[in-house]
Amino acid sequence: MAKDDVIQMQGEVLENLPNATFRVKLENGHVVLGHISGKMRMNYIRILPGDKVTVELTPYDLSRARIVFRTK
């Protein structure tokens, strides 16, 4: 999949789930399932409920997302 196909959005982490998965509420009100990207996992970046994150969604499955950036 090309990088051009992704949709980037801002959201807030609602809760931690097993296997580095999180429930994220997007700015538009939708709640999606997000997992940590590989670079964030390799650099041991911690994500806690309440953190603001940037997620990437594919146009094929809008219920799942990849967390690519965490802001304070």
From Swiss-Prot:
User: From the record, what ranges are coiled-coil?
Assistant: none
Q: Where in the cell is it found?
A: Cytoplasm
Highest taxon of the lineage: Bacteria
Q: Name one GO molecular function term.
A: rRNA binding
The UniProt entry, under InterPro entries, shows: NA-bd_OB-fold, RNA-binding_domain_S1_IF1, S1_domain, TIF_IF1
Q: Does the keyword NAD apply?
A: no
Give a Pfam family name: eIF-1a
Ranges for domain S1-like come to 1-72
Task: Provide one Gene Ontology cellular component.
Answer: cytosol
Q: Mind listing the UniProt keywords for this protein, alphabetically?
A: Cytoplasm, Initiation factor, Protein biosynthesis, RNA-binding, rRNA-binding
Q: SUPFAM superfamilies under this entry?
A: Nucleic acid-binding proteins (SSF50249)
Q: How does it assemble?
A: Component of the 30S ribosomal translation pre-initiation complex which assembles on the 30S ribosome in the order IF-2 and IF-3, IF-1 and N-formylmethionyl-tRNA(fMet); mRNA recruitment can occur at any time during PIC assembly.
Role = One of the essential components for the initiation of protein synthesis. Stabilizes the binding of IF-2 and IF-3 on the 30S subunit to which N-formylmethionyl-tRNA(fMet) subsequently binds. Helps modulate mRNA selection, yielding the 30S pre-initiation complex (PIC). Upon addition of the 50S ribosomal subunit IF-1, IF-2 and IF-3 are released leaving the mature 70S translation initiation complex.
Family, similarity comment: Belongs to the IF-1 family.
Protein name (Swiss-Prot/TrEMBL): Translation initiation factor IF-1 2
- Specify the species: Cupriavidus necator (strain ATCC 17699 / DSM 428 / KCTC 22496 / NCIMB 10442 / H16 / Stanier 337) (Ralstonia eutropha)
